């Protein structure tokens, strides 16, 4: 038996109701294109081949998906879902099974697709759902024994059929041999004059194939996106699910409705997240982490007992246990904070390591620097790392004291336990235990008369 699994993803729609120059499948949900959600799910279930059927904006779609290994097939005319799958037949293996998915139905889960595949015993399985309001959706017809006999589209349904509440999601797992057999025989003899993929169900029933049906765990798994309102609604449903998952793991949210998770977040115990916090990319939070209001954390690792005060931005940062950051701190890529460091108001760190117990508390920029343990940066102290062409490194030894409003002009090294006087511009290396002052002498003119304004 051939157990290979192919996915056919229909992604040719223009998405006119989006009022966008971008193809619909490139619209963003949780910081990721709709189509990318589907592709990531396919990767997680070890698909052997993925075929994407594209149409409007095909160049844009292909350029946006270069990180994936895909087979692209163009649908030049949009003549229905059956036609869309039919154009992929030349790329479809003759054996194995195929999942038929949609680029604008982004949230079907890997677990649901795995169950759908397992349910395909006789050649075809499908994802259905019983809903309160089935208007506009294809209805599932069953016989007295509960066997599926047909799918009837809304515009072709009788009054009795329109009363059926079990609907077709359009997501199937079908033996490739059946797709090769049935798709060439589809007809467009219907109200829409389109080639319905649903007609393969009728063909399978006529051949005596028992069609299996399963339901997803969540209704949003089969919800499609056609306009901005639906996109926003689906975003909120997805966010609620992600927040719920973290709550189960012990995270306390000040308001579960005012947080956005746009990636993967792993957590320890007793994490607290205040309002309007955004997580992007891969984020890990240790035990007893507190994140106050308005922070954005992207691709960062946060250790135990870290306190992040309001309105901080982290991007590719590693923060060790016991650190306190903010408010209004900006940690840029390749920032490493060691244990018990403290960053305060309006501090920016870029491509630098701040040693254990060091403090950069006020109005500072530290870039391309290696800062030792126990160092104190006074208010307004900065590293001058860029000469207009190249970046240069600043090294500060353990227990150094950098006075207020100091400029360290890289490349420069400050020795251990060195002291830099306030207001200095340091352009040369400073030895261990030395005091360096690089500023003009104070001049005082007694009885100074200010200039008077000319009349």
UniProtKB/Swiss-Prot annotation:
Pathway info: Nucleotide-sugar biosynthesis; UDP-N-acetyl-alpha-D-glucosamine biosynthesis; N-acetyl-alpha-D-glucosamine 1-phosphate from alpha-D-glucosamine 6-phosphate (route II): step 2/2; Nucleotide-sugar biosynthesis; UDP-N-acetyl-alpha-D-glucosamine biosynthesis; UDP-N-acetyl-alpha-D-glucosamine from N-acetyl-alpha-D-glucosamine 1-phosphate: step 1/1; Bacterial outer membrane biogenesis; LPS lipid A biosynthesis
Cystine connections: none
Cofactor comment: Binds 1 Mg(2+) ion per subunit.
Cofactor(s) essential for the protein: Mg(2+)
Chain residue ranges for the region called N-acetyltransferase: 250-455
Binding site residues for UDP-N-acetyl-alpha-D-glucosamine: 10-13, 24, 75, 80-81, 102-104, 138, 153, 168, 226, 332, 350, 365, 376
EC assignment: 2.7.7.23, 2.3.1.157
Catalytic site positions: 362
Region (Linker): 229-249
Catalysis: reaction(s): alpha-D-glucosamine 1-phosphate + acetyl-CoA = N-acetyl-alpha-D-glucosamine 1-phosphate + CoA + H(+); N-acetyl-alpha-D-glucosamine 1-phosphate + UTP + H(+) = UDP-N-acetyl-alpha-D-glucosamine + diphosphate
Segments of this protein annotated with the region Pyrophosphorylase: 1-228
One Gene Ontology term, aspect cellular component: membrane
Signal peptide: none
Top-level taxon in the UniProt lineage: Bacteria
Family statement drawn from the similarity comment of this UniProt entry: In the N-terminal section; belongs to the N-acetylglucosamine-1-phosphate uridyltransferase family.
Protein name: Bifunctional protein GlmU
């Amino acid at each position: 038996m051939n157990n290979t699994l192919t996915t056919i993803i229909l992604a040719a729609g223009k998405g006119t109701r989006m009022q966008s120059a971008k193809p619909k499948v490139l619209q963003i949900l949780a910081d990721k294109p709709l189509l990318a959600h589907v592709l990531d799910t396919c990767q997680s279930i070890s698909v052997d081949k993925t075929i994407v059927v594209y149409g409007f904006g095909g160049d844009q779609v292909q350029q946006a998906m270069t990180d994936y290994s895909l087979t692209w097939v163009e649908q030049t005319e949009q003549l229905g879902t059956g036609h869309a799958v039919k154009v992929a037949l030349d790329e479809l293996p003759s054996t194995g099974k195929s999942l038929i998915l949609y680029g604008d139905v982004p949230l079907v889960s890997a677990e649901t697709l795995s169950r759908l595949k397992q349910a395909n015993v006789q050649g075809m399985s499908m994802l259905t759902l019983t809903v309160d309001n089935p208007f506009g959706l294809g209805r599932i017809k069953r016989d007295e024994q509960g066997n599926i006999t047909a799918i009837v589209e809304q515009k072709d349904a009788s009054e009795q059929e329109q009363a059926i509440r079990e609907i077709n999601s359009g997501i199937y797992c079908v033996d490739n041999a059946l797709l090769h057999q049935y798709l060439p025989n589809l007809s467009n003899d219907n109200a829409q004059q389109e080639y319905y993929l649903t007609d393969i169900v009728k063909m399978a029933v006529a051949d005596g194939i028992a069609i299996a049906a399963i339901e997803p765990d969540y209704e949003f798994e089969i919800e499609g996106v056609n306009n901005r309102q639906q996109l926003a609604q689906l975003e909120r449903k997805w966010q609620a699910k992600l927040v719920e998952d973290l709550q189960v793991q012990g995270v306390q949210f000040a308001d579960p409705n005012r947080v956005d998770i746009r990636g993967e977040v792993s957590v320890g115990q007793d994490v607290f997240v205040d309002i309007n916090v955004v997580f992007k990319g891969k984020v890990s939070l240790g035990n007893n982490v507190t994140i106050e209001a308005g922070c954005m954390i992207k691709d960062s690792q946060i250790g135990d007992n870290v306190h992040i005060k309001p309105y901080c931005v982290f991007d590719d940062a590693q923060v060790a246990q016991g650190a306190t950051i903010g408010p209004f701190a900006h940690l840029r890529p390749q920032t490493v904070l060691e244990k018990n460091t403290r960053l305060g108001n309006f501090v920016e760190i870029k491509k630098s390591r701040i040693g254990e117990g060091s403090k950069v508390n006020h109005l500072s920029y530290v870039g391309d620097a290696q800062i030792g343990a126990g160092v104190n940066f006074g208010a307004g102290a900065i590293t001058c790392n860029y000469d207009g062409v190249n970046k240069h490194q600043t090294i500060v030894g353990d227990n150094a004291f950098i006075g207020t409003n100091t400029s360290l002009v890289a490349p420069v090294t400050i020795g251990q336990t060195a002291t830099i006087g306030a207001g200095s511009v340091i352009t040369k290396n400073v030895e261990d235990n030395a005091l360096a002052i690089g500023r003009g002498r104070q001049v005082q003119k007694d009885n100074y008369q200010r200039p008077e304004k000319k009349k």
